[in-house]
């Protein structure tokens, strides 16, 4: 009940508290339990918290909060995965107006075999809607447990609806309001996935460090070898940068929520809608978190050598369990599309002052970067500012070439998202290090600053690679000299 109001049995924890809890639960070492918890506290219940009426909240939330009831979420279908609004599951109002007759199928439903309540996306009168269906409802059948390569302690099943009679009072909001319960919950689910990765990454590093210290080769601990130290250093950088990004993102969302009036009858609806403003940021956390965890696990696996491949050691399970994180809560490809398109929308609407920033970029290219920061990390700050400038140039060139059709240019959108991810992670990390510099000096902690320096240096090179892919796509390999000159000044 971390997001549930106290009156319905929850704790209504702060969003920062939620992030800390996600990190702590994942450090316990059971990704399957993290999955159950994440579904229970995000996609399985947020739709009710934010968009349910008082009677619906009283009926379902106390049991979900106490754990007496398990929650699940039904969105994916055999013919509607990433294109979720293409749902073939339908609800038709009964002749007496008391029920929706639901027909259709859902697949890959986490918590499905155990759940008591299911938030189900469907079409009613051709309009995308969300409804709560309870276990045991006539016409509702739960399929067999899927045999998975990982997350074996979690439940994943198909759901079948055959003339399933669901009371009309189970509809969340009105007919056609399905996007809120479905996608706003997914936004927070994506964030929690990234936040949960932090604890798992810390645990993986702990295992790898302990093993490296104890494992002897050539008469010494393998932790003394440069190649092993490089893997551990990279793992530390990945963990610190993800941690910085998560708390930066949740801090911004908390600020937006704090501006809402708690006495407003629509407070929780508006809180849910607030997540729409942070689609890009939550997608960044999900993509970077799942991919950072994957890279870290691979390094830790390698440190274990042959033992990494043996099930009684910790890295084999971690390797299997993590793979799904790049797929569920929206594939990383889709999240890159969401991230890229969200920023394009903000640029075209004038929300982020894109035209004004382009003028600033021209000044950068003529007179050099000026971040306004004069501290020890000036080079790193300017590296991130250069990445932002490169992003702006690439976005402007993409819009000039493709106009309103830019949304269909997936290679361009994906690489724009890659630049944006680097810039956001780099900015979050540097902001944290600069803000806490006195504390780090006092405690003689040098690792945070080193993490920031290495991350910005390595990713800065990749930014130019992403930019070249974008411009080569636009100009068929013949990039104008003017743009090459701009990039040379920013690189």
Language-model features: where?
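Internal helix-loop-helix
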Residues: 2-58, 62, 66-67, 110-114, ...
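A short core secondary-structure module
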Residues: 98-142
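Glycine-rich beta->alpha junctions and the first turn(s) of the following alpha-helix
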Residues: 141-243, 283, 324-328, 332-337, ...
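C-terminal amphipathic alpha-helical interaction region
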Residues: 364-491
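Loop-to-helix element that buttresses phosphate recognition and phosphoryl-transfer chemistry
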Residues: 209-210, 231-270, 417-438
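Short Gly/Pro-enriched turn/cap motifs at secondary-structure boundaries
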Residues: 79-82, 108-111, 123, 148-155
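A structural signal for short hydrophobic beta-strand segments in well-ordered beta-sheet cores
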Residues: 89-93
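Alpha-helix capping/hinge segments and adjacent helical runs
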Residues: 109, 151, 272-363, 451-491
């Amino acid at each position: 009940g971390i997001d549930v109001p106290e009156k319905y049995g929850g704790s209504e924890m702060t969003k920062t508290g939620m992030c800390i809890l996600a990190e702590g639960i994942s450090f316990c070492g059971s990704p399957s339990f993290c999955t159950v918890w994440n579904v229970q506290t995000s996609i399985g219940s947020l739709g009710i918290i934010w968009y349910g009426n008082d009677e619906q909240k009283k009926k379902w939330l106390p049991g979900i909060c106490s754990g007496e009831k398990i929650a699940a979420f039904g969105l994916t279908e055999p013919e509607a995965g990433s294109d979720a609004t293409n749902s073939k599951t339908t609800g038709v109002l009964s002749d007496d107006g008391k029920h929706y007759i639901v027909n259709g199928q859902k697949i890959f439903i986490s918590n499905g075999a155990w759940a008591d309540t299911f938030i189900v996306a469907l079409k009613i009168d051709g309009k995308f809607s969300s409804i709560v269906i309870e276990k045991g409802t006539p016409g509702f059948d739960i399929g067999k447990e899927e045999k998975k390569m990982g997350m074996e302690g979690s439940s994943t099943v198909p759901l079948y609806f055959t003339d399933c009679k669901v009371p009309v009072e189970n509809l969340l909001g009105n007919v056609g309001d399905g996007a809120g319960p479905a996608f706003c919950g997914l936004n927070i689910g994506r964030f929690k996935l990234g936040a949960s990765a932090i604890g798992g990454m810390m645990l993986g590093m702990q295992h790898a460090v302990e093993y490296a210290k104890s494992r002897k080769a050539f008469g010494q601990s393998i932790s003394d070898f440069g190649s092993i130290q490089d893997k551990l250093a990279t793992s530390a950088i990945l963990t610190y940068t993800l941690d910085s990004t998560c708390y930066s993102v949740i801090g911004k969302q908390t600020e937006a929520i704090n501006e809402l009036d708690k006495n407003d009858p629509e407070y929780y609806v508006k809180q849910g809608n607030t997540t729409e403003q942070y689609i890009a940021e939550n997608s960044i956390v999900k993509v970077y978190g799942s991919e950072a965890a994957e890279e870290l696990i691979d390094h830790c696996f390698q440190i274990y050598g042959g033992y990494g491949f043996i099930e009684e050691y910790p890295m084999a399970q971690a390797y299997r369990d993590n793979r799904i994180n790049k797929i569920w809560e929206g594939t990383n490809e889709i999240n890159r599309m969401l991230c890229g398109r969200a920023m394009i929308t903000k640029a075209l609407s004038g929300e982020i002052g894109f035209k004004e920033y382009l003028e600033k970029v021209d000044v950068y290219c003529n007179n050099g970067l000026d971040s306004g920061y004069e501290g020890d990390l000036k080079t790193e700050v300017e590296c991130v500012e250069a990445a932002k400038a490169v992003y702006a140039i690439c976005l402007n060139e993409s819009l000039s070439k493709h106009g309103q059709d830019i949304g269909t240019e997936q290679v361009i959108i994906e690489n724009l998202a890659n630049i944006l991810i680097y810039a956001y992670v780099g900015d979050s990390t540097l902001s944290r290090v600069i803000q806490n510099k006195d504390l780090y000096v006092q405690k003689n902690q040098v690792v945070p600053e080193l993490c920031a320096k290495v991350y910005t240096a390595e990713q800065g090179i990749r930014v130019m690679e992403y930019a070249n892919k974008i411009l080569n796509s636009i100009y068929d390999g013949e990039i104008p000299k003017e743009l090459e000159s701009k990039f040379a000044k920013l690189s």
